[in-house]
Structure formats: structure tokens, C-alpha cells
Amino acid sequence: MNQKLEQVQKEALALCAPVFHEMEEISLFNTEKVLTAFRKHHLSAYHFAPSNGYGYGDPGREKLEEIWCDIFHAESALVRPQFVSGTHALATVLLALLQPGDTMVSAVGAPYDTMESVIGITGNAPGNLISKGVHYKEVPLKGNTYDLKAIADAVDENTKLVEIQRSRGYMLRDSLFPEDIKKIIDTVKAKNPETICFVDNCYGEFTNCLLYTSDAADDMQC
């Protein structure tokens, strides 16, 4: 290889080294956290055996959900192959928590495109939230990120649920860091402590060394 190219390669690797090191540290931290949960809950080959669940329960699924709770500091979890997509999981949560007359607020601009029909923003899908009498508010972004003042203004005594989407999805806004999510949750709870803070944490699992949203959010979808 040309000596000049070799030098460029060395300089590029040296420049990237701190980032690679940080990624390795995050990976090691989270791998250790998962393995610790495996040991704590005595995961074994027995739990990977197939089961029809008929009359006997499903120990593998139950063990997986125990481990998931431990890793994310949750009270309970649903980790099931019956959820065919993230939209399916999100819709399940929203349809379970929201009743006619309740108000839902999307705190970080518009949600995923696929959620628009679930909420009833577009189309006329049977059973969408708006058709069931759920009120919907959307807090516009401030430039390329969230607006805490606007979020506070959107929350009142009638706000049942605030959805916080961590990933930018198909938009060009910034994705949220755990610190950002905590600020939004604190803002919502200061305005109405009874409001449910629901975090869509899709693509955000195991990407840092913080316990983050699970310590502050009421519900979280991963």
C-alpha cells in the first residue's frame, strides 16, 4: 500500500478510536447486565424447550419476562412473539390505557407514520383512538428538537397519557438521549403527576450505560 495512504489510515483509526472505545464499553456494560440477569433468574436449557402452553404454562416465556423486568427495572413485561411489529405493540398499549374522553399528547412532534391510522390522524381504520372518543394533541418541534414549554402548556388535568418517541423515525429531528426523556417526563409530572408517561424506546435498547427511561417512565415499549 502507498505510504501516504497508510498514514491516512492510521490517522483515521486514531481519530475514531475514542468512539470505538466508547461503543465497546457500552457493549460490555450491557452484556454483563444481561448475563447477570440470566444467572440471577437461573436461566437454563430447560427454558428453551418448546411448549404448547396447554394446561402447563410456558416456563420459557415466563422466565424471559422475568429477565426483561430485571434488565429494564420494570414491574411487569410482555415479551411475546404474538406482537408482530412495533406498531402492533404500541397500539396494544394505547388501546389498553386510553378510554373515551381521555386526552393523549404526542410530546415530540408527529409519531411514526404507521401510528397515524392507529390514532386516527389519517384514514378511517376501524377502532382507531379518535373514533373511540380519545382526544389527541401534538406538540410541534422547536427547530430540530423538543419544546419543554410547549409540552407543559399541552398538559392539563385531563391529559391521560403523553407519548414520547425516542427515535426520530422517518423525520429529520434529533433522536432523544435518556437525559432528554427524563426532562420531558419531569416536565409532564410537574404539570400533572397522574399523567401516564409512555416511552416508545424502539431502537434505544442497550445503546448507553444508563438505566434511563425505565426509572422514570410509567410504560415503555422496546
Over which residues does each language-model region extend?
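Active-site rim recognition segments
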Residues: 31
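N-terminal small-domain helix-loop-helix segment of the aminotransferase-like
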Residues: 52-60
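A broadly tuned, weak detector of single residues within folded domains
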Residues: 61, 97, 217-218
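Long amphipathic N-terminal alpha/beta scaffold segment
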Residues: 63-74
